[in-house]
Regions:
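Extended, helix-rich architectural segments
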Residues: 1-134, 454, 460-483
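Extended, charged amphipathic alpha-helical segments
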Residues: 203-342
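C-terminal helix-loop subdomains that flank or include functional centers
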Residues: 289, 317-483
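Amphipathic alpha-helix face/heptad-repeat signature
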Residues: 106-110, 245, 311-314, 318, ...
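Short secondary-structure junctions and interdomain/linker hinges
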Residues: 20, 75, 79, 95-102, ...
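Non-transmembrane, amphipathic alpha-helical segments
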Residues: 103, 303-310, 314, 346-357
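Intrinsically disordered, low-complexity linkers and terminal tails enriched in Pro/Gly
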Residues: 196-209, 294, 465-481
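Extended, regular secondary-structure scaffolds
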Residues: 111-113, 117-229
Length: 483
């Protein structure tokens, strides 16, 4: 079995992954040709190329991925990591991505395909560890084994395509295909082997033995990401159905614009007209077609309105289906008022998918940071405190003015605390994301806001501010009385 063999899981999903890659641009869809749009019977190659060029890709899949990714990433990730690890955040990968860019990439790929991977690695000669990122199609074949009560990754092959200078011209590059093999050897230690395709087969290089603080690893530092769970075995991506609908929509647009082409350029026909050798019929205002045959006919052939209407109806139906599958991001605004309960029911499944992707990304990035922390020599105490938190509040609704007024009245009457009021503002993103509730209270209680403090919390607090004897807002109620 060659080193670039793929697992049965990858084989089952690779066609869908390729389709998703092609849906990223109209050019890729058209270049794929008969993979998606069949060549009509009797069409020449030139006619087929003109036929498929008339199609138009409706970017439903791409826009939905951007929308779902944006829902998770609209607030920056919150991270607690050792200082030595945070120092790596600005230059996190081999191609210079920072921490937030890495998280966004993981979320995007989880939304698109539901499978992704990161290898934590460092140069063979040592140095700063970096992250190497692998798309679903590049993760060829993981091998796992039960050791005790755990399922351990003991082998993994990864496809890589790198550009290297040409031997005959150093100013030009050529793409070299290689497979990076990660495995646990017979002695229980981690090693890497690069296999390069020289045109006649795969040639294995010398083994590489990565170390952490001078010690060889006993585990493979590769982290898998998924949409529903972080597993070595890939599952169908959350938007695969949307991808198939988008392809079907593209196929029908090819027929639609092909039909419009012939509607705009109707074909003339004539029957029963006798022509001499070399003679032809011409169209023009000064030309008339005359025949002695009473059965002669002439006219223009074109597609009827009913045919175009049927295609338009099919396109409209597909767009509505994509709207449903794609979390309603493409849905047109509906007339009338929808109840909050009805809206909540419609959003529940969408939010569950987003929440699952966010949770899986959190867990995977936590493991990545743990590997980095070990690599830079962080203590076990520091490692135990590592945490990654992504946004799981996907509601973008604005504050109802009546709700805000009612809460402010409750604040002034002493039926809710200052902290509760500020927490509400924090959740609704009225307060800056980087500012804590305690910092907001300190700003409110600053000397510049004495008049406002008196209006909101009473004269006792205002006097304390003036005298520079600030009292915590949590120990003073809204009537200015100490609690």
């Amino acid at each position: 079995m060659p080193v670039d063999s793929t697992s049965t899981y990858v084989d089952a999903l690779s066609e869908g992954w390729t389709m998703i890659d092609d849906l990223q641009s109209e050019k890729l869809m058209k270049d794929a040709g008969t993979d998606y749009v069949a060549q009509l019977t009797g069409q020449s190659d030139d006619e087929y190329r003109a036929y498929i060029r008339r199609g138009s890709l409706f970017g439903a899949f791409v826009r939905t991925v951007r929308g779902l990714t944006g829902a998770i990433m609209r607030k920056p990730p919150q991270v607690n990591a050792p200082v030595k690890v945070e120092e790596l955040f600005g230059d996190f990968t081999l191609d210079g991505k920072d921490f937030n860019e890495v998280v966004r990439k993981v979320v995007t790929e989880n939304v698109k395909k539901g499978y992704y991977g990161i290898l934590v690695d460092s140069p063979p000669e040592g140095g700063t560890p970096k992250l190497a990122m692998y798309a679903a199609n590049a993760i060829l074949q993981p091998t796992v084994k039960r050791i005790g009560n755990e399922i351990k990754l003991i082998g993994l092959t990864l496809q890589e395509n790198i550009d290297v200078p040409r031997e005959d011209d150093p100013y030009e590059t050529e793409e070299i295909e290689q497979v990076r093999e990660l495995k646990i050897d017979e002695d229980g230690f981690y090693e890497q082997i690069l296999h390069v395709n020289d045109g006649s087969g795969w040639v294995a290089g010398e083994p590489i033995y990565p170390t952490i603080m001078g010690k060889r690893l006993t585990e493979i530092p590769f982290v898998f990401f998924g949409a529903s769970e972080n597993s070595t075995a890939p599952k169908e991506g959350p938007l695969l159905d949307l991808g198939y609908l988008n392809v079907k929509h593209f196929i029908i647009t090819v027929d639609y614009f092909h039909a419009l082409h012939f509607c705009g350029l109707p074909t003339p026909f004539a029957a029963g007209f006798k022509l001499k050798d070399g003679e032809s019929l011409h169209i023009g205002s000064a030309t008339a077609w005359v025949s002695e045959d009473p059965q002669a006919k002439c006219g223009m052939l074109q597609l009827g309105a009913d045919g175009i209407g049927a295609i338009e109806a099919a396109l409209d139906k597909l767009e509505k289906q994509m709207s449903v599958v794609g979390s309603r991001m493409l849905d047109q605004a509906r007339a009338g008022v929808e109840t909050a309960e009805g809206l909540l029911i419609k959003q529940t499944s969408d939010f569950a998918i987003l929440s699952s992707i966010a949770s899986c990304t959190e867990a995977g990035m936590h493991d990545v940071l743990v590997w980095l922390a070990r690599w830079v020599g962080a203590s076990e105490s520091e490692i135990s405190k590592i945490k990654v938190m992504l946004n799981k509040d996907f509601s973008t609704s604005e504050i109802d003015p009546q709700v805000l007024t009612a809460l402010f009245v409750a604040l002034q009457s002493g039926t809710i605390s200052v902290d509760s009021f500020l927490y509400f503002l924090k959740q609704k993103e009225v307060l800056p994301n980087h500012r804590t509730i305690e910092e907001e209270k300190s700003l409110i209680l600053s000397g510049e806001n004495t008049e406002l403090v008196e209006k909101m919390f009473g004269s006792v607090v205002a006097e304390d501010v003036t005298d520079n004897r600030l009292k915590s807002a949590s120990s003073v109620n809204t009537n200015g009385q100490e609690t």
